[in-house]
Amino acid sequence: MKERLISLIESALDTLITDGTLPADAKRPVQIDRTRDKSHGDFATNIALMLAKPAGMKPRDLAEKLIAALPNDSAVAKVDIAGPGFINFFQADDWLTGLLDSALADDFLGISRPEQPQTVVVDYSSPNLAKEMHVGHLRSTIIGDAVVRTLEFLGHTVIRQNHVGDWGTQFGMLLAYLEEQKTEEGERELSRELANLETFYRAAKQRFDESDSFADRARALVVKLQSGDDYCLTLWAEFNQVSLSHCQAIYDRLGVSLTPADVHGESAYNDDLAQVVADLDSKGLLSESQGAQCVFMDAFKNKEGEPLPVIVRKADGGYLYATSDLAALRYRASTLRADRMLYFVDQRQALHFQQMFTLAKLAGFVPEQTELAHMGFGTMNGPDGRPFKTRDGGTVKLVDLLDEAEQRAFALVQEKNPQLDDEELRNIARSVGIGAVKYADLSKNRSSDYIFNFEQMLSFEGNTAPYLLYAYTRVASVFRKAELDMANVSGDFLLNEDAEHTLAARLVQFGEVLQNVADKGQPHLLSAYLYDVAGLFSSFYEHCPILSSEDERIRQSRLKLAALTARTLKHGMELLGLSPLERM
């Protein structure tokens, strides 16, 4: 609707420029906003205020001329002027009910497919395979996945890239320990050790710190690994396979759409690193600094005003994250043919990605028109406001966090529904517990830090997963009571009551909200929308009897509105990665 109104206003502006009311250079970008007070219509624009000065007119006088020049449109019932010159648009009920019918009849709730779908590469999760996944991996994993699902729902081609940390000096230490354990304990004992990667890593680190001979062996294995030694590569692949299976188990439990096929880690770019450096050199971008190969760009300086280096090869010949990130950017542009690349990585890496994106385009690795965006996020903190840790100050493993979430949810659901059997309790607890952890994050602006609090996230009040899941079951219960499949609702939409009209107007904004999520990489916009829809349905349910309505036409209309609410909530929660329940 916003695009439709913008087109109408632009047509009116052209008319006023043609008749001399406005100067030829007076055209400005038109901004349309939704109104908060529905007595002022559904949409408003301040274009008359913006153009009053170049027109040499009072804003209200210009607004009157703009309204007179607007083409007729069936979507608009009325246009008026408010305050100093705001133009308010009232949406026609016939237009609104048409949108509702289209949404109800369509698998995509009336959201049209893009004429030119984009290929979007999304880099997210990307854990270090040397260790088990911990709470620090949660935000990238679930925020990235929500945006991926939204982009696909809108009709774009999405290529997931799980850029795992599967290379580097720490693997020498791990391979040395793996080799040692194979010799001393045999395959069965070794597999038991690898079942807990964190313990394995700590044991390897302890050996590295305490034994000079072990440390020497670890360093030698790094060199052999990086030179392509078959023995080392076999050990390395064995370790990575175990680590990746740990990651996949977490993804499956979280309901995240990443699969082994999406893994394209640091090691995938090893063969291209030397060429990246050579190509930077051939373009005259390289400089030597203390033996290292660097790129200096004028746009990036330190506090003293000196250029900051991007080091692509160390003095000892080794490569860095910057080198593999540049190789990844080139691969994603040239091989994956990305129109857009989104990186869901901690916002503390903002400078690194600014440098990478600038350099990739400067070097011609990525076309100028390709959108490169770092979707940074804040930290998940404990009650003390510091990064979330265990009681002894250690890193919280993600599997332990999810275990506790399900246990707490089980106790909560059992208390509310003691009559349920264990299997049903476990299924509900899984949906509520995992959903609560995810939604507590996804309902926050990704750029903000937030406090992790089990009591708040498992509450059935406020903007939480339990509240939203329950809201959906409440709508679904209407159709169980009516013994009606919501796919079989019929009749016309009749929006006679304010609560009906307000809910209907919000439901048809689903596509607009999803587009904002896709454009900005901000799933909290969808969370806020779903919470609002759930609240509006509650008000509608309270003020507009559905099954007890004596007028069959009104009853059918309200059932249709309930059906569209249910489908909107269900689709929305699924895009966030939640698992809606028919009963709770």
UniProtKB/Swiss-Prot annotation:
Pfam families linked: Arg_tRNA_synt_N, DALR_1, tRNA-synt_1d
Catalysis performed (reactions): tRNA(Arg) + L-arginine + ATP = L-arginyl-tRNA(Arg) + AMP + diphosphate
Group of enzyme by EC: ligase
Entry GO terms, CC: cytoplasm
Record carries keyword Repeat: no
GO molecular function terms attached to this record: arginine-tRNA ligase activity; ATP binding
Subcellular location: Cytoplasm
UniProt feature coiled coil, ranges: none
EC number: 6.1.1.19
Major localization class: cytoplasm
Subunit structure: Monomer.
Protein name (database record): Arginine--tRNA ligase
Native organism: Alcanivorax borkumensis (strain ATCC 700651 / DSM 11573 / NCIMB 13689 / SK2)
